[in-house]
Amino acid sequence: MYSMMMETDLHSPGPQTNTNPGQTGPNSGSKANQDRVKRPMNAFMVWSRGQRRKMAQENPKMHNSEISKRLGAEWKVMSEAEKRPFIDEAKRLRAMHMKEHPDYKYRPRRKTKTLLKKDKYSLAGGLLGGAGGGVGMSPAGVGQRLESPGGHGGSASAGYAHMNGWANGTYSGQVAAAAAAAAMMQEAQLAYSQHPGSGSHHHHAHHHHPHNPQPMHRYDMTALQYSPISNSQSYMSASPSGYGGISYTQHQNSSVATSAAIGTLSSLVKSEPNISPPVTTHSRGPCPGDLREMISMYLPTGESGDPSVQSRLHALPQHYQSTTAGVNGTVPLTHI
């Protein structure tokens, strides 16, 4: 229907211009005719003049746009024989117009109203799609924060958020808050990985990188499974491939160091399958108090009393301190 109305507007000056002299008075109509020469009516306009007046008398409350839609639909279903007299009349009017105005050239006026209306609708559609009723705004911002430290632009981050389904506004406020916390942890991880180091950087990264991704992947598990608490087995099976594929391949300079780190990590996980990674990462070396509290908030409490876990936790900080002492003599994560 909208395309038919556009065709009508393209072929003719519009039905409103014909009724202007009757509505505003003869003086203003004559002034308008003196200033601007109207285009000759096409066949549809010749036919719709009488039909529009008739339909307006039958339905006085009907809007003009609805009348135009109905007239356009009627004109399309009419046969060529029914259209023929109106086509001939339009040709006669065009010939008369060419005689009266031989130097006439059609100069289309700027349709500022239609352009503004289209821009308004497109803007509203974009806001509805991006905001999703107000809930999806913060996940979209999280997508930007996740992508911006890596050097991507705003358009890429918007596409990233849409691809992952964050911007449809169907998630609850708790998931949005979880995503915001995950973005903070991702920023901390990226800032730490860009910290300058020496040749033993891959050992250092291997022992300290799991501090950051663990809460982020825990949020991912809750978002995917729609459950408040994810069990440790599914978490353990999902986390090595998750951050092993992302953090190591993105932040290590050597592929040999990458494969060695992943191999060590997989053997570490396979050797003790009953111990979840969050417990081991909780006591790995010195880290800031707020980060430790943030991680320990999501740890299962029942496994911390296991004696094998305690002996392993006592051995890990010594190994961590011996490996991190060679990296420029600095304590990691103090700049976050």
Swiss-Prot record:
Basic residues: bias regions: 200-211
A molecular function GO annotation: RNA polymerase II cis-regulatory region sequence-specific DNA binding
Pfam families xref list: HMG_box, SOXp
Keyword set, alphabetical order: Activator, Developmental protein, DNA-binding, Nucleus, Transcription, Transcription regulation
InterPro entries, alphabetized: HMG_box_dom, HMG_box_dom_sf, SOX_fam, SRY-related_HMG-box_TF-like
Region (Disordered): 1-39, 193-216
Superkingdom as given in the UniProt entry: Eukaryota
Motif (9aaTAD): 293-301
The keyword Transcription regulation belongs to this UniProt entry's keyword annotation: yes
Compositionally skewed regions (Polar residues) per UniProt: 14-32
Entry comment describing in which tissues the protein is expressed: First detected at the tail bud stage in the forebrain. At the 3-somite stage, also expressed weakly in the hindbrain. At the 12-somite stage, strongly expressed in the forebrain and weakly expressed throughout the central nervous system. At the 21-somite stage, also expressed in the lens.
Any one Gene Ontology cellular component term annotated for this protein: transcription regulator complex
Primary localisation category: nucleus
Subcellular location: Nucleus
DNA-binding region, residues: 37-105
Single Gene Ontology BP annotation: negative regulation of transcription by RNA polymerase II
Protein role: Transcriptional activator.
Domain notes: The 9aaTAD motif is a transactivation domain present in a large number of yeast and animal transcription factors.
Protein name: Transcription factor Sox-1a
Organism: Danio rerio
Name of the coding gene: sox1a
